[in-house]
């Protein structure tokens, strides 16, 4: 992988979820440095909406994809927000 590659998160982890990033979300590697097995990844939303997060993600938790669709991130974010409102507990929620 390298800077500007499009990637998808392939696991659900609490460390990513605390920043609003969940399995299936798509982003792009926004820094050329590969640090301690991680890439800095930006997870955008569509248009003028604020980005979900820019966080370090382990390379093993990513897969490279050809094209990134920010609408996927908005859909996943909405699912988690809806589940959180309904139960207040996301520990058993899966995408």
What is each model feature region?
Residues 67-95:
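Long, low-complexity intrinsically disordered regions
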Residues 2-64, 68-69, 95:
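Basic/aromatic-rich interaction segments and small domains that mediate binding to polyanionic partners
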């Amino acid at each position: 992988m390298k800077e500007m590659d499009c990637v998808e998160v392939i696991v659900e982890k609490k460390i990513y979820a605390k920043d609003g990033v969940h399995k299936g979300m798509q982003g792009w590697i926004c820094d050329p440095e590969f640090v301690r097995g991680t890439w800095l990844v930006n997870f955008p939303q569509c248009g003028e909406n604020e980005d979900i997060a820019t966080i370090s993600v382990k390379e093993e938790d990513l897969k490279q994809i050809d094209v990134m669709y920010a609408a996927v991130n908005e859909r996943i974010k909405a699912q988690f927000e809806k589940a959180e409102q309904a139960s207040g507990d996301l520990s058993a929620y899966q995408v």
